[in-house]
Amino acid sequence: MEPYATSDQIWQGALIFSRIGAVLLMLPGIGESYVSPRIRLSLALVVSLALWPVIAGALPGLPATVGGMAGWIIREVIVGLMIGALLRSFLTALATAGEIVALQTTLAFAQTTNPLQASPGTTVSAFLMLLGTTLIFATNTHHLFIAGLVGSYELISPVAPLVTGDFASLAIRTFGDAFMLGVQLSAPLLVFALIFNLASGLVGRVMPSFQVFFAAAPLSILLGLSVFALSLGVVGTVFIDRYRALARIFAGGAGG
């Protein structure tokens, strides 16, 4: 064995690093702006070296031209960004649920900086997204990310044509499922808001002189947050189960 890396080995390492680095750039909890670029770069390098013996056989040979090399690198970066964006987009389910909860508890005006989004959002939405990211690592779901990196080389082989139609269909279905899940997670608050508003309207009709708004506003916040706290365990469990199912789409290629 040669004591130094050959040109083919360097080429394989560059291809692996291109896809894995792009995926890690988008993953929840790892690709955030508050995570140091040095940490992300080091993690991508370590994971690339660890997975090199496993996926080196699925990589194309060294092209004869610089243009060919650049084309392969760009292709792998695009594939990595697509996979990472798909895994990250499912967090919009929690953002949707948080916005609905905030609207139903009259807390939509309470805006805060959301570290997982580029724009500020409601406090409830930021809390749910941070909770979801924490659960991903607390339940070892991030292990499926590593298995998914390996499996992605079987689902989207570097030597096969890049089929964007299938991935676009998967992305559309994922966005639709994320929105539907967000509404489902906020269903207890929607039911509570419907009953509470009907009761408040009935009281206002029965006792016109009673100041319903001044009594209903604090009760809406108190009871709404109580219902939200009681349903929080179910929200976390349902989300992490659905997220693991999404991650297994790629991990399944590696026998995950």
Residue ranges and their predicted role:
Residues 1-256:
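Hydrophobic alpha-helical segments and their helix-loop boundaries in membrane
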